[in-house]
């Protein structure tokens, strides 16, 4: 396993995930009968700071359809948690309009690179262009100064 599992931390994430799903109206328990489901949910709500109990609750009561999605969410969160420890693996998100993202993705595919690599290449291209324009402007100014002196 690439990322170490931290039981207490992940138990808290699972508790938050389940509570959030419950508040969004999803069925988080395996029970069809609403009173049994509500008893199980009430139990869960009381065990926020008891990681072992949360894990036992999950084993006993979780909706099987939700279990895999929760595992995927926790796996992604674990990855983000460990990646955030190092500057070179830390990720940030940006909002792009769909058409901008589409053009960027197409360019990345043509260049056979990731979106991040493509953005870095575009920035470097723009910086080189700016530097070239500054050099040309400076040369033009120097040339005018030389010709003006004569």
From Swiss-Prot:
It is found in: Cytoplasm. The keyword Cell cycle applies. It comes from the Bacteria. One of its GO terms (cellular component) is cytoplasm. GO terms for molecular function: sequence-specific DNA binding. Pfam families: MatP, MatP_C. The keyword DNA-binding applies. Keywords: Cell cycle, Cell division, Cytoplasm, DNA-binding. Its main location: cytoplasm. GO terms for biological process: cell division; regulation of DNA-templated transcription. Belongs to the MatP family. Required for spatial organization of the terminus region of the chromosome (Ter macrodomain) during the cell cycle. Prevents early segregation of duplicated Ter macrodomains during cell division. Binds specifically to matS, which is a 13 bp signature motif repeated within the Ter macrodomain. HAMAP family: MatP. Homodimer. This is Macrodomain Ter protein. It comes from Erwinia tasmaniensis (strain DSM 17950 / CFBP 7177 / CIP 109463 / NCPPB 4357 / Et1/99). The gene is matP.
